[in-house]
Amino acid sequence: MRTVVQQVREASVSIGGELHSSIGTGLLVLAGISRDDTADDLAWMSRKIPNLRIFEDEKGKMNRSLKDIGGALLVVSQFTLYADASRGNRPGFSESAPPELARVLFDRFVESIRHEAGCPVETGVFGADMQVSLVNDGPVTIILESPKKP
């Protein structure tokens, strides 16, 4: 599993020009599911993200987590995180999970991170054409990948 985690002052998802979901201060998580991901990958990522100490403390050091600041999460599925553009100019997506599997795993991930984070969690709509808006704070952007299997 691969995620792009962005610290935001606000973020939202619109679909067809209509606001679908939004958060204030917190994290926007773009989540990619690979064809090899398992429940272990989802659990690892669900524990990692809410506990990342990427928010500044009173001394200006990245020392506070989402849980510490009482922030929110906006989680958006993004299969293009597994794009491979190493050959040619059109990316391939053979590493991405097939849509049926990705939907199931994404829903489980959202459930799991809701439980782990204990904060408001909003989402996009799996497979929809979404417009994602954000005000990046910092900017702080972290790319996470679940540990490789032996």
Curated annotation (Swiss-Prot):
Keywords: Cytoplasm, Hydrolase, RNA-binding, tRNA-binding. GO terms for biological process: D-amino acid catabolic process. Belongs to the DTD family. GO terms for molecular function: D-tyrosyl-tRNA(Tyr) deacylase activity; Gly-tRNA(Ala) deacylase activity; Ser(Gly)-tRNA(Ala) hydrolase activity; tRNA binding. Pfam families: Tyr_Deacylase (PF02580). It is an enzyme of class 3 (hydrolase). Homodimer. InterPro entries: Daa-tRNA_deacyls_DTD, DTD-like_sf. A motif (Gly-cisPro motif, important for rejection of L-amino acids) lies at residues 138-139. The gene is dtd. A Gly-cisPro motif from one monomer fits into the active site of the other monomer to allow specific chiral rejection of L-amino acids. Its EC number is 3.1.1.96. Its main location: cytoplasm. PANTHER family: D-AMINOACYL-TRNA DEACYLASE 1 (PTHR10472:SF5), D-TYROSYL-TRNA TYR DEACYLASE (PTHR10472). It catalyses: glycyl-tRNA(Ala) + H2O = tRNA(Ala) + glycine + H(+); a D-aminoacyl-tRNA + H2O = a tRNA + a D-alpha-amino acid + H(+). This is D-aminoacyl-tRNA deacylase. An aminoacyl-tRNA editing enzyme that deacylates mischarged D-aminoacyl-tRNAs. Also deacylates mischarged glycyl-tRNA(Ala), protecting cells against glycine mischarging by AlaRS. Acts via tRNA-based rather than protein-based catalysis; rejects L-amino acids rather than detecting D-amino acids in the active site. By recycling D-aminoacyl-tRNA to D-amino acids and free tRNA molecules, this enzyme counteracts the toxicity associated with the formation of D-aminoacyl-tRNA entities in vivo and helps enforce protein L-homochirality. NCBIfam families: D-aminoacyl-tRNA deacylase. GO terms for cellular component: cytoplasm. Coiled coil: none annotated. It is found in: Cytoplasm.
